[in-house]
Amino acid sequence: TICRTHVIIYPMTENEPIKTVSDGITFLSTGRYYDGINRWVAHKLKDGDNDAIDYAARQIAKLLPQNAVLVPISGHHGKVEQTMQLARAISSYTHLPIVDALRGIERESQYDAKKKGQTLSAEDMGFYKYKDLPSNRTPYLIDNVVDTGNTAKAAIKALGCGTVASFAMSDTLLQREE
């Protein structure tokens, strides 16, 4: 018996940069969350894996202009943690300044709330501007993954302006904008 297999080759679109605008805020990402290894890398970022941080930083660095200032988005503990590690790694490639300008209240994570079928509001996150930004630079808020965009939107609202740059973006925000 002879078995034949058919191989279908799809064009590679993995890790193509994404740019979308939602509620007047620009979101940039290195690729879709569910493409290739992005989901795995995103989980490793949350674990603080140095190789994942370095990989994500190199990808995000390609998206940023020379006049950017990196602003890590604070996590559910109210302070920057994983996003600061990522911002430092990005800065090591780009030499862009980092300003720890945002704080928030300690809260449940957006990820955990979503698993319960809930979404945190801007008020739940309690973001506020903690430090001033240089006036000659454009703020780029750094996040690991953007899903609904609600966290980033609340952070930008607190800062007053900025663009969001993330490693991966889920289809949730993209489907809202189609």
Predicted segments, located by residue:
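Active-site-facing substrate-recognition patch
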Residues: 3-68, 103-136, 170-172
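Short, well-ordered alpha-helices that flank and scaffold nucleotide-derived cofactor binding pockets
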Residues: 62, 88, 92, 157-161
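Short glycine-rich phosphate-binding loop at a beta-alpha junction
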Residues: 67-76
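Hydrophobic anchor at the start of a short beta-strand
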Residues: 68, 139, 161-164
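Hydrophobic Val/Ile/Leu positions in short beta-strands of Rossmann-like dinucleotide-binding domains
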Residues: 72, 141-142
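Substrate-recognition/cap helix-loop segment adjacent to the acidic, metal-dependent catalytic center
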Residues: 80-96
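A phosphate-binding catalytic loop at a beta-strand-loop-alpha-helix junction
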Residues: 142-155
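A short, conserved beta-to-alpha structural element at the edge of catalytic cores
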Residues: 153-157, 161-178
